[in-house]
Regions:
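A generic structural-conservation signal
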Residues: 70-71, 138, 157, 269
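HTH-adjacent hinge/linker in prokaryotic transcriptional regulators
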Residues: 2-4, 8-27, 31-47, 52-118, ...
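Alpha-helix/helix-capping structural signal
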Residues: 120, 141-142, 251
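Short Gly/charged-rich anion-binding patches and loops
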Residues: 27, 56, 99, 124, ...
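Conserved phosphate- and dinucleotide-binding cores of soluble alpha/beta proteins
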Residues: 4, 13, 17-20, 30, ...
């Protein structure tokens, strides 16, 4: 009796066309390293195999230290910056970001010292801020511009090396100033939040300045729309357990909701 082996059949077909597992790994790594990142669907089409097989390949390659897995794909371990230009990000999920920023305005009070990161959601927060006596500390040039016509708001700029991509200041000078300030609360966003409660950033420059701002703050508030959930990026910024409140626009997954409840993290929709 002939027993059909799907595994043997697949291996024979791949070998016949020169696309065995090793060659497939090479194809996957070459494409991801060239593009910086790739989705599971994209890789499945290029390798002409199932999405499930690609997921297994990516998990195996991550264990070998050859790439980083993300939700729905993978990124190159040679990549140092996965961030998008600010002028692109400001229009993505703009309605949701404005909604979240408006809800976070309840945090404001007179004479507060407020830290604002260089995220597009913080930029919406800066635009919506009423002109009340307070101080804003920021590394974002666009936050400065948003506040320039609000005379009651004093703005402290971190200085540092200017990034035209992010329209913000970074580096040792920025971090040096933040280490010497006392901030009542900071507003920041991120590139992703996974179901284990880890908060991710697209590059070390952003992550490092945000960490220093959070360390200088009595309270830290995360503003993140639904597109950030179940998603990783390049650099782990911190954990949700380190923040006080999460402002968002959608319900959390059961896993993430349980994490927030366990760690007493308030979630505001």
């Amino acid at each position: 009796m002939f027993i059909f082996s799907k595994k043997l059949y697949n291996e024979t077909i791949f070998e016949r066309f020169g696309v065995n597992m090793r060659n497939r790994d090479d194809m996957i790594l070459q494409w991801i390293n060239q593009q910086g990142k790739a989705s599971v669907i994209e890789l499945a089409e290029k390798c002409d195999i199932s999405v499930e097989t690609i997921r297994r390949d990516l998990n195996r390659l991550e264990k070998q230290g050859l790439l980083y897995r993300t939700h729905g794909g993978a990124i190159s371990n040679k990549t140092t910056d996965l961030g998008s230009f600010f002028q692109t990000r400001r229009y993505i999920n703009a309605t949701e970001k404005r909604y979240i920023a408006k809800n976070a305005l309840e945090l404001l009070y007179e004479n507060a010292v407020i830290g604002l990161d260089a995220s597009s959601t913080s930029w919406y927060f800066a635009h919506l801020m009423p002109d009340i006596p307070c101080t804003v500390v920021t590394n974002s040039m666009l936050n400065i511009n948003a506040l320039v016509n609000k005379p009651n708001i004093k703005t402290i700029v971190t200085g540092g090396v200017y990034s035209s991509k992010y329209e913000a200041f970074y580096g040792p000078l920025s971090e040096y100033l933040l280490q010497r300030l006392h901030i009542n609360f900071s507003i920041f966003s991120c590139s992703g939040i996974d179901n284990q409660g880890n908060i991710w950033e697209s590059n070390e420059l952003n992550a490092s300045v945000k960490r220093k701002m959070m360390e200088a703050s009595e309270h830290a508030y995360l503003l993140a729309d639904h597109s950030k959930f179940e998603k990783k990026s390049l650099i782990q910024l911190t954990e949700l357990s380190e923040i006080n409140t999460l402002f968002t626009d959608s319900d959390l997954s059961e896993t993430l909701q349980a994490y927030c409840e366990k760690n007493d993290i308030l979630t505001i929709l």
